[in-house]
C-alpha cells in the first residue's frame, strides 16, 4: 500500500510556549520520500505557520 498516514505539527508553537496545532493526512511514499513541510493555519497563534511531518 503506497499511501501512509502522517501527522503535521506546528514548528513555531513550542518555541512560544503555546499548544501545538496538528493536522492529519496521507502522502504517497513512492512520490515523496522526504518529510513534508506545509504552511497551515494555527488557531492558537492565529496565523499561518510552518507545519512539519512528525510521523
Swiss-Prot record:
Pfam (any one) = Ribosomal_L33
Which UniProt keywords are listed? Ribonucleoprotein, Ribosomal protein
InterPro entries registered for this protein in UniProt: Ribosomal_bL33, Ribosomal_bL33_sf, Ribosomal_zn-bd
Q: Which GO terms describe its molecular function?
A: structural constituent of ribosome
What is any one of the record's Gene Ontology cellular component terms?
A: cytoplasm
Domain of life, per the record?
A: Bacteria
According to its UniProt entry, the protein's GO biological process terms are: translation
HAMAP family referenced in this protein's UniProt entry, alphabetically: Ribosomal_bL33
Q: Which PANTHER family match?
A: 50S RIBOSOMAL PROTEIN L33, CHLOROPLASTIC (PTHR43168), LARGE RIBOSOMAL SUBUNIT PROTEIN BL33C (PTHR43168:SF2)
UniProt similarity note: Belongs to the bacterial ribosomal protein bL33 family.
Give the protein name, as stated in the record. Answer: Large ribosomal subunit protein bL33
Organism listed in the record: Methylacidiphilum infernorum (isolate V4) (Methylokorus infernorum (strain V4))
Taxonomy, top ranks, is: Bacteria, Pseudomonadati, Verrucomicrobiota, Methylacidiphilae, Methylacidiphilales
Please state the gene responsible for encoding this protein: rpmG
Amino acid at each position: 500500500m503506497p499511501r501512509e498516514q502522517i501527522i503535521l505539527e506546528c514548528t513555531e508553537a513550542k518555541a512560544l510556549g503555546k499548544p501545538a496545532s496538528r493536522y492529519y493526512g496521507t502522502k504517497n511514499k513512492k512520490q515523496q520520500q522526504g518529510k513534508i513541510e506545509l504552511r497551515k493555519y494555527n488557531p492558537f497563534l492565529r496565523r499561518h505557520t510552518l507545519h512539519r511531518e512528525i510521523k
